[in-house]
Amino acid sequence: MRIEQINARALEKVNYDRYLLSQAIAKRVNELINGAKPLIELPKPNMQLTEIATLEIAEGLVKVKEV
């Protein structure tokens, strides 16, 4: 799946609120940096953490709460 499609699906999960999505991605990236395991099987070996977090949100594996 292309990154544009992943971003569109992730935006859909947060009711098209770009600010909320960026905050959720940042929080998940921090969790990954601090040792959390990815919730998805990585489709390519050297994915960036922001790509992993966005894909997890798009797949519905990370729930995003309103701020």
Swiss-Prot record:
Top EC class of this enzyme: transferase
GO biological process, one term: DNA-templated transcription
SUPFAM superfamilies reported in the protein's UniProt record: RPB6/omega subunit-like (SSF63562)
NCBIfam families (alphabetical): PRK00392.6-2 (NF001579)
HAMAP family found in the cross-reference section: RNApol_bact_RpoZ
Classification via Gene3D superfamilies: 3.90.940.10
Assembly and oligomerization: The RNAP catalytic core consists of 2 alpha, 1 beta, 1 beta' and 1 omega subunit. When a sigma factor is associated with the core the holoenzyme is formed, which can initiate transcription.
EC number: 2.7.7.6
Keyword Nucleotidyltransferase found: yes
Protein name: DNA-directed RNA polymerase subunit omega
Pfam families xrefs: RNA_pol_Rpb6
Keyword Transcription on entry: yes
MF-aspect GO terms: DNA binding; DNA-directed RNA polymerase activity
Stored InterPro entries: DNA-dir_RNA_pol_omega, Pol_omega/Rpo6/RPB6, RPB6/omega-like_sf
Function field: Promotes RNA polymerase assembly. Latches the N- and C-terminal regions of the beta' subunit thereby facilitating its interaction with the beta and alpha subunits.
Reaction catalyzed: RNA(n) + a ribonucleoside 5'-triphosphate = RNA(n+1) + diphosphate
Organism placement in taxonomy: Bacteria, Pseudomonadati, Campylobacterota, Epsilonproteobacteria, Nautiliales
Record's keyword terms, sorted: DNA-directed RNA polymerase, Nucleotidyltransferase, Transcription, Transferase
One Gene Ontology CC term in the entry: DNA-directed RNA polymerase complex
Species the sequence originates in: Nautilia profundicola (strain ATCC BAA-1463 / DSM 18972 / AmH)
